[in-house]
């Protein structure tokens, strides 16, 4: 199945990874490049959760609260203990007593939030994870048909927020109905997590704590790669800026005015730079020399030495800061 990133997905793409340290490949139609994978710098798998099944293999990783994941990552970096529990976008009340760190054999219970609006009306404002307002209502109607609970009618006023009204017949106890809803409908569901991820192209059964540790270490490695890439770019910028300053300030460009061939021009520039090579941090390459020949006369005449010095100092400060961060 081939897909294309557009709109908000492109925005997310630009915010969760660095294109300069990402491996790219051509898209299915060859018109653009797309990432081989997303080197995300936060525990996206644990934040969103994941579920899948294959021959003899399955996984069910529950979603977790993003802020709690970040706090746990900080504790991980500080060598402190942490504990993670699932948190669901549909809200609801969860019992994590037997969560077992999201490993095989664990189990949690999630309940809808049900309140008594008046003596004949119940209101559901939060539903369990894995259910929808429609599937929840269907389970309530089936329980009513089987005589497990007694209801008069249901109103689904769900919009951006869940609001399901359950109208009860006269004389029916709201408390007993709530107990029946938890016992016989999807107002209470049991979920069995199964932590399974792919590591080095092999399935690995593990808990969410270990997943977070791996994610945190991966984030450190990605940040290190970004800083190393930034340092490389800054060093190259410093080299180019310093080389340009020497070329113009020492009037090396005048050495090429009477040269009749391209080879002689390049040789003259190399000879002119020799007395100043000790000021540079890296070797002057053939490409460096060619770039100097591309500087226009107008740019040379308007060259500001003080401005160039400030630019070089600014680059040096950025290099120092990047080295410190590394």
Model region roles, listed by residue range:
Residues 31-38:
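Active-site-adjacent "gating/activation" loops or surface patches in catalytic cores
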């Amino acid at each position: 199945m081939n897909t294309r990133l557009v709109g908000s997905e492109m925005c997310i793409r630009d915010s969760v990874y660095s294109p300069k340290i990402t491996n790219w490949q051509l898209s299915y139609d060859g018109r653009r490049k797309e990432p081989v994978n997303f080197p995300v710098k936060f525990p996206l798998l644990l934040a969103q959760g994941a579920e899948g099944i294959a021959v003899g293999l399955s996984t069910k990783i529950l979603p977790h609260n993003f802020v709690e994941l970040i706090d746990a990552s900080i504790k991980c970096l500080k060598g402190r203990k942490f504990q993670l529990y699932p948190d669901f976008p549909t809200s609801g009340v969860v019992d994590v007593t037997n969560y077992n760190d999201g490993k095989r054999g664990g189990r949690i219970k999630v309940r809808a939030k049900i309140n008594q609006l008046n003596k004949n009306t119940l209101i559901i404002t939060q539903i369990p994870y894995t259910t929808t307002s429609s599937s929840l209502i269907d389970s309530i109607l089936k329980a009513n048909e089987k005589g497990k609970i007694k209801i008069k009618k249901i109103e689904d006023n769900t919009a951006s927020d869940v609001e399901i009204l359950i109208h009860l017949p006269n004389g029916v106890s709201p408390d007993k109905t709530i107990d029946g809803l938890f016992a016989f409908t999807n107002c209470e569901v049991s979920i069995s997590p199964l932590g399974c991820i792919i590591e080095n192209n092999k399935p690995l059964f593990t808990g969410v704590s270990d997943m977070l540790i791996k994610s945190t270490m991966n984030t450190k490695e990605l940040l290190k790669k970004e800083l190393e890439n930034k340092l490389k770019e800054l060093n190259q910028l410093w080299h180019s800026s310093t080389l340009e300053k020497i070329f113009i300030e020492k009037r090396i460009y005048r050495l090429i005015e009477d040269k009749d061939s391209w080879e002689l021009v390049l040789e003259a520039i190399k000879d002119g730079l020799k007395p100043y090579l000790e000021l540079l941090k890296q070797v002057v390459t053939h490409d460096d020399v060619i770039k100097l020949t591309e500087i226009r006369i107008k740019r040379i005449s308007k060259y500001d030495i003080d401005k160039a010095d400030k630019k070089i100092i600014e680059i040096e400060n950025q290099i120092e800061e990047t080295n410190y961060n590394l």
